[in-house]
Amino acid sequence: FSAYADTCYAVDQMGLVADLSGYLTDEEKAAFPESYLTEGDFDDNGTIKIFPVAKSTELLFLNDTDWQTFAAATGASYDDLSTVEGLVATAGKYYDWTDARTEVPDDGKALFGRDAMANYMLIAAKELGSTIFTVENGKMTVNLTEDVARKLWENYYVPFVKGWFAGEGRFRSDDIKTGNVLAYVGSNSSATFFPKQVQVSDTESHDISLKVLPNPSFAGSEEVAVQQGAGMVVTKSTPEEEAACVTFLKWFTQPENNIQFAVGSGYLPVTHAADDMTAIENSGLDLTD
């Protein structure tokens, strides 16, 4: 069954999850990034309890059509969105610009939203040199410093309070659809849900185009990116049934099959061979969308 690490861990605590490490050779294991295989190694002893099939990271998705109008009027550029600080400053400019377009005071619009606040906290803290928590021998230790916590606050919650950031729909792509925001950071797989129109009202809508940019990082920091995604978990059974499951998963993650799945779903390939732009371009699959 498909599961994230937290679900797999809960089932593993019941003694129901099979260790798949014995069904793969060292060469087969080397086909995957090490961090993908160790995600389910809960006891840090080389077990493989989550077989990677789909991964994602985060990107910035932009309503480029309406952005171009704003950029032409204010001189804003894509480079302004490359850092967290630049994003916040640009969001402030966008709020002021939209506010000035009407006679109603303080009715500016938000520029930006995030799908996963937790990812921002974890990744941004690491960029700032602080791992929020560590776990050793089953014990968690919180390491977040006051300075880092304040910087995270000032670049996320403060813009929310000021109306520069927003999050009203279930997902930020919903807020793009209604025109509540122009941009959001979310999973690369969410590209398939990016709307082709903004529905301003029941009677007014307009077409938009998508621009994809890197997830902004803190200025001067070492860039850090999240890797996430559900994998396949095999419940304990007979050796023959477990081996059959692994045989299928090996087939599913062969480069040609993994590329086809990744292109069709918007997820990242999970093997080194499939995670290659030349191989993807040579696959013959339609990459225009």
Regions found by a protein language model. Name each.
Residues 7-10, 118-123, 127-128, 150-241:
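Extracytoplasmic/periplasmic substrate-binding proteins
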Residues 66-77, 238-245:
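Short helix-loop capping/hinge motifs at secondary-structure junctions, enriched
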Residues 4-59, 125, 205-216, 281-288:
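Hinge/lid segment of periplasmic solute-binding proteins
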Residues 21-35, 76-82, 105-106, 110-112, ...:
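Short, solvent-exposed loop/beta-turn-alpha elements that line the ligand-binding surface or hinge
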Residues 174, 189-192, 196-200, 230-289:
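Mature extracytoplasmic/periplasmic domains
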